[in-house]
Amino acid sequence: MSQTIDLTLDGLSCGHCVKRVKESLEQRPDVEQADVSITEAHVTGTASAEQLIETIKQAGYDASVSHPKAKPLAESSIPSEALTAVSEALPAATADDDDSQQLLLSGMSCASCVTRVQNALQSVPGVTQARVNLAERTALVMGSASPQDLVQAVEKAGYGAEAIEDDAKRRERQQETAVATMKRFRWQAIVALAVGIPVMVWGMIGDNMMVTADNRSLWLVIGLITLAVMVFAGGHFYRSAWKSLLNGAATMDTLVALGTGVAWLYSMSVNLWPQWFPMEARHLYYEASAMIIGLINLGHMLEARARQRSSKALEKLLDLTPPTARLVTDEGEKSVPLAEVQPGMLLRLTTGDRVPVDGEITQGEAWLDEAMLTGEPIPQQKGEGDSVHAGTVVQDGSVLFRASAVGSHTTLSRIIRMVRQAQSSKPEIGQLADKISAVFVPVVVVIALVSAAIWYFFGPAPQIVYTLVIATTVLIIACPCALGLATPMSIISGVGRAAEFGVLVRDADALQRASTLDTVVFDKTGTLTEGKPQVVAVKTFADVDEAQALRLAAALEQGSSHPLARAILDKAGDMQLPQVNGFRTLRGLGVSGEAEGHALLLGNQALLNEQQVGTKAIEAEITAQASQGATPVLLAVDGKAVALLAVRDPLRSDSVAALQRLHKAGYRLVMLTGDNPTTANAIAKEAGIDEVIAGVLPDGKAEAIKHLQSEGRQVAMVGDGINDAPALAQADVGIAMGGGSDVAIETAAITLMRHSLMGVADALAISRATLHNMKQNLLGAFIYNSIGIPVAAGILWPFTGTLLNPVVAGAAMALSSITVVSNANRLLRFKPKE
């Protein structure tokens, strides 16, 4: 028997996620229908709630059974048509929709640590999703679990954690930790290398590293000094390895601890009981333990410094908010801390000020630099009634404005939150690295043991020496750290660089999908064009003059919300408009009504044809206007066509240049519009569009996208984020030209903070560059380990008669991580080609 189960969803961030969950549910034979939004699902069928939840989890998201909720006391004031467009996948932001918590982590050294911490956090009751970022040493946790429970779970897994609620405090603590960590690694590297280098040089020049009766006491002192180095400069490796062992796990620190520990124990055994070893096996490796610890600490220090550079983009955003605001009251003006500013307060801005909160100008004019927020390099003129956003700078002028959004609810705060979430996310390509990392260290230990056994039983004499060298070198050269950093470092740098160009990326998956696109579909109105239609010509027929035709058309359009209506009303200006009775909106056709005793029709040719109004006599004029890219709006009075109003929405100033960039990059460009084919083709020709899909109603846009996808195309849809919601959700990547609007920021896979198609070209270029960088890092890490481990195991011995020195292995290990981080940081200097 069929039943409807209501589920609460978590982890969905855009229309693509909604689509994935819906498809996963509908693929089940026991599901008849699945209605999915970004926060909930209503599923009809015979499947149980547990089965549905498991299906959603397999799709990569979380779900729980919903509890009935009371209906709101007041209905939304959003127009019904907007709600219809948005309801499927694009809910507007709410004041309390951010249930995420951020933790600062310590003690993590490689991708194996990430897996352990993530599993520990996800096992806490109330946690719906946990994202651990090795590059930033942070965790982003979604759900209702308390900070204390989260910290305890991380500590129980053998790592450190600190819950941070305030952004400023988080930044301060993160910087303090980073500086302290770099200082610690620096002195540890100096201490270890100060011992290791002289011992190694002396061994190569003045001694042969072999223990004899004459130098036994000296080597014993060197051994004890090396032990002190291992404790003070490398103690963190051994403590971490011990904690991992207690938790039944193994990490990079386990490999370092085993490699250096075995080398030192062997050397000390030879030092204390040389009689137990044959003469040729009395070689000492104290310098190897000290040098390995020194080089790896040096690598960690350089890596930490490079990681700090990768977070610069986010730090720049955090720097945009001033610490104070200038409050205007009846008593005068005074400076108040930003935390005290509340919505409704009146604030003043003067030249050079940075806007503290979002608001609306009530008095004055000013030029504002919004470059850091939107990527728009040209200052914008703002006056009474215009909105201002936190983080922008007053270049010239003075205004009063009323605060509307403060603290975490400003556009800037939401951007920062979105950037941070994107930097903590993982693309599908990163999941391969995670799977390998989960078993990497145990596999390396097994390889080291097997290699050592082979050399012990089948290798040349002295077997014990070769066995030790092989085991130590294999353990030291293996680097799960490079593997773990490969993806997150590229994501942090790529997402941060995109933000500097005014491009907000919802998650890493969006970057990966955007890098594989081959087709870009544009909504026409407001995307390719200015979105401000203008009446460019009025042609009259019969006995109606231009003023009368314009007056009747404007009277009808008073009741319409269509974009063309505003153009006609603007053209009419201050004309006295007659009263209209019986007004009706005819969807996709136009409007009708009665005025001054006449029956009026205003709309496209299809409307007049449907109402049996002859248009044959004016078809030549209709075609002529349409061929010039204008939309012909026809006016009929008492069943007779009397006027044609040519309405044209001009292309954006940078549309042609942006589309040329996309063409050069190899994308096929498609325009999706409700216009008639003649008008649409004229605009497409002017813009440089390859393909036109015309005459499409709003609810048919998603089907048009689906048709393109059925041809095997990877499709991006560029629209305004509200009217194009179904198409944005259907596309492989939805790109909203949101201009900072709530719905656009909170819902799109990619949001452009400025209304410019150059942002589309920038977004796709950065996506390609980021994925390319990510593949370079992963390939480099795989090649390093694929070649390094066999070489360390002695595969070259039969051909060259040489083995890899453990010290060289330690240097290579440190260098591999530094290389990955440095390569990712190249993205911070990436500039899309013009």
Curated annotation (Swiss-Prot):
Classification via SUPFAM superfamilies: Calcium ATPase, transduction domain A, Calcium ATPase, transmembrane domain M, HAD-like, HMA, heavy metal-associated domain
Position of sequence motif CXXC motif 2: 110-113
Binding site residues for Cu(+) 2: C110, C113
Gene3D superfamilies: 3.30.70.100, Calcium-transporting ATPase, cytoplasmic domain N (3.40.1110.10), Calcium-transporting ATPase, cytoplasmic transduction domain A (2.70.150.10), HAD superfamily/HAD-like (3.40.50.1000)
Membrane topology, Periplasmic segments: 208-217, 275-283, 459-463, 800
Keywords for this protein: ATP-binding, Cell inner membrane, Cell membrane, Chaperone, Copper, Copper transport, Cytoplasm, Ion transport, Magnesium, Membrane, Metal-binding, Nucleotide-binding, Phosphoprotein, Repeat, Translocase, Transmembrane, Transmembrane helix, Transport
Motif (CXXC motif 1): 14-17
EC id: 7.2.2.8
Reaction it catalyzes: Cu(+)(in) + ATP + H2O = Cu(+)(out) + ADP + phosphate + H(+)
Name listed for the protein in its UniProt record: Copper-exporting P-type ATPase
Gene: copA
